Amino acid sequence: MARYFRRRKFCRFKAEGVQQIDYKDLATLRNYVTESGKIVPSRITGTSAKYQRQLATAIKRARYLALLPYTDLHK
């Protein structure tokens, strides 16, 4: 049986040389939140532990300040 080629995950923030993840950068934060509002884990995104912690803090701040919704499934 042939195994499928799986793309190597890498930390986007480390590759771009980002020092601090900003809670006001909503375009970036939306890529790391699911439709149901959950923060996507680093094993799926490939984000390093340092930046995953910063990402979680930034998302929580943006939610608290009503910049990001807690969930997109409101009806």
From Swiss-Prot:
The keyword Ribonucleoprotein applies. Signal peptide: none annotated. Pfam families: Ribosomal_S18 (PF01084). SUPFAM superfamilies: Ribosomal protein S18. One of its GO terms (biological process) is translation. GO terms for cellular component: cytosolic small ribosomal subunit. It comes from the Bacteria. GO terms for molecular function: small ribosomal subunit rRNA binding; structural constituent of ribosome. Keywords: Ribonucleoprotein, Ribosomal protein, RNA-binding, rRNA-binding. The keyword rRNA-binding applies. Binds as a heterodimer with protein bS6 to the central domain of the 16S rRNA, where it helps stabilize the platform of the 30S subunit. Part of the 30S ribosomal subunit. Forms a tight heterodimer with protein bS6. NCBIfam families: S18. Belongs to the bacterial ribosomal protein bS18 family. This is Small ribosomal subunit protein bS18.
